[in-house]
Regions:
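Conserved Walker B catalytic segment
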Residues: 1
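Interdomain motor-coupling "hinge/lid" segment immediately C-terminal to the ATP-binding subdomain
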Residues: 4-126
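C-terminal accessory/connector segments of nucleic-acid motor ATPases
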Residues: 110-121, 126-166
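Non-catalytic, well-ordered alpha-helical scaffold segments
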Residues: 57-61, 66-73, 111-115, 144-147, ...
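A generic structural signal for short
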Residues: 50-52, 137-138, 215-216
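A cross-kingdom feature that marks ATP-driven nucleic-acid transaction machinery
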Residues: 148, 154-158, 162-278
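A short, surface-exposed helix-loop junction/capping segment
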Residues: 96-101, 126-135, 202-215
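Short, solvent-exposed loop/helix junctions and linker helices
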Residues: 22, 111, 140-143, 217, ...
Length: 278
């Protein structure tokens, strides 16, 4: 019968696409058996009450551990099972290798553009303002020649594209300057591994130094990346804003930047990321 023949045919209206992001901090805490910390954070935020220094330090240690482990389920599962950081790093290196294999398939028709872009993400974020500079790839490189490769990385959710807006208005997309952008890693734990990838292995003390903020690397870019990751997982498109401002007593305008802009209830919410110990 017709009914029998069409049983397994999926009609487009019945198909729903679900975007799968790396585990966020709340999901990570659940995986570790912690059902208290996130609720305490939410309650403190809603009531605008501080948690206290001791509790804050404990939460920040958990958050830093989450940053370096990352939100990839296999890496989180290894952490929960008590694997060493070196073993977790090995898992993340394998994930990066799988990403590179996927990019290589795309690059058969695009002259390795996506692979090169992906490999330069840590170096790009190391820049003073984190803006993506094509000159780090090729001094003659131009945005229009690489736009498809950047879009592929973002659509594959390997990276998160953050676009400059010329005006901080509610309809952010209307003022998007796509040629001026930042490119974050989709998972911050993978960014940490990518930064350390030139080492044959990542030692335990290296990871512990990251967790306790005792490692002399640009922690700012790691913090920016984790905020971008969390905003994206919460359903926000990523935008930032540059503007000129003349401070009191100054003769010349100076350039300033708002790290992220989010829209909530028809209002713009500026987000500034700081990596200090407090």
């Amino acid at each position: 019968s017709i009914r029998k023949n069409v049983t397994n045919i999926l009609i487009p209206s019945e198909e729903y696409r679900i975007k799968m992001y790396p585990m966020d901090f709340e999901e990570y805490l659940w995986a570790t058996g912690d059902n208290v910390t996130f609720e305490a954070m939410q309650s403190a935020f809603q009531h605008r009450k501080p948690l206290g220094d001791a509790i804050h330090r404990k939460i920040m240690q958990k958050f830093r551990t989450y940053m370096v482990v990352g939100g990839m389920p296999q890496a989180v599962n290894a952490f929960v099972e008590g694997k060493t950081f070196a073993q977790i790093d090995f898992i993340k290196r394998n994930i990066l290798s799988l990403y590179e294999e996927d990019l290589a398939k795309y690059d058969t028709e695009n002259r390795e553009k996506a692979s090169v872009i992906f490999k330069t993400i840590p170096e790009q974020l190391e820049n003073k303002n984190s803006h993506f500079r094509f000159s780090l790839i090729d001094k003659n490189a131009r945005y229009q020649n690489y736009v498809d490769a950047v879009s592929f990385i973002a659509e594959a959710m390997i990276g998160n594209e953050c676009i400059n807006v010329t005006k901080p208005e509610v309809a952010l997309e209307l003022f998007a300057d796509r040629s001026n952008f930042k490119l974050y890693m989709g998972d911050t734990g993978l960014l940490v591994t990518q930064i350390m990838r030139n080492r044959e292995d990542t030692e335990e003390d290296l990871y512990k130094a990251l967790i306790f903020d005792n490692l002399g690397i640009n922690q700012g870019m790691i913090m920016e990346n984790i905020v971008a990751q969390m905003l994206k997982a919460a359903g926000h498109d990523l935008y930032f804003h540059e503007y000129q401002y003349l401070p009191d007593g100054a003769i010349k305008e100076q350039k300033y930047e708002i790290d992220f802009l989010a829209v909530k209830k028809k209002k713009i919410c500026p987000i500034e990321v700081k990596s200090s110990g407090r």
